[in-house]
Amino acid sequence: MFSTEELQAIDTEYFRMIVMDPYDLTIQSKCTGHYWYLHSTGYSSDGPCIIFHKHRYQHPYHQHGRARTLRQAVKSIKNHDVYQITVRGHK
């Protein structure tokens, strides 16, 4: 479960918030336009945060990875954006 403090720490200058509750967070990167769905399993072992990703709204999500914390998941997303922008020349 994501805590209120974790959810409030999401950078709204960087992300557009779409859905936010204790178990599910859907955000869009303002840098790349990519969509991210983060799901808290509620279990503390085996990567309790599952990260799903898609490039466009109409595309289906695919699993991008797992994280131990919401903060770690957000860091992974920002690193993905850096890769998209610098290596793939996105935007």
Q: Can you annotate each of these PLM segments?
A:
Residues M1-G33, H59, K91:
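Negatively charged, low-complexity tracts enriched in Asp/Glu with abundant Ser/Thr
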Residues M17, L25-I27, W36-L38, I50-F52, ...:
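Hydrophobic beta-strand residues in large extracellular and virion-surface proteins
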Residues Y14, H39-G42, S76, D81:
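Functionally constrained cores in energy, signaling, and assembly domains
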Residues T4-L7, H53-K91:
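Mixed-charge, Lys/Arg-enriched low-complexity segments
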Residues S3, L25, D46-I50, A67:
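Broad hydrophobic/π-residue packing in well-ordered secondary structure
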Residues T32-H62:
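Short aromatic-glycine-(Arg/Gly/Cys) micro-motifs in beta-strand/loop hairpins
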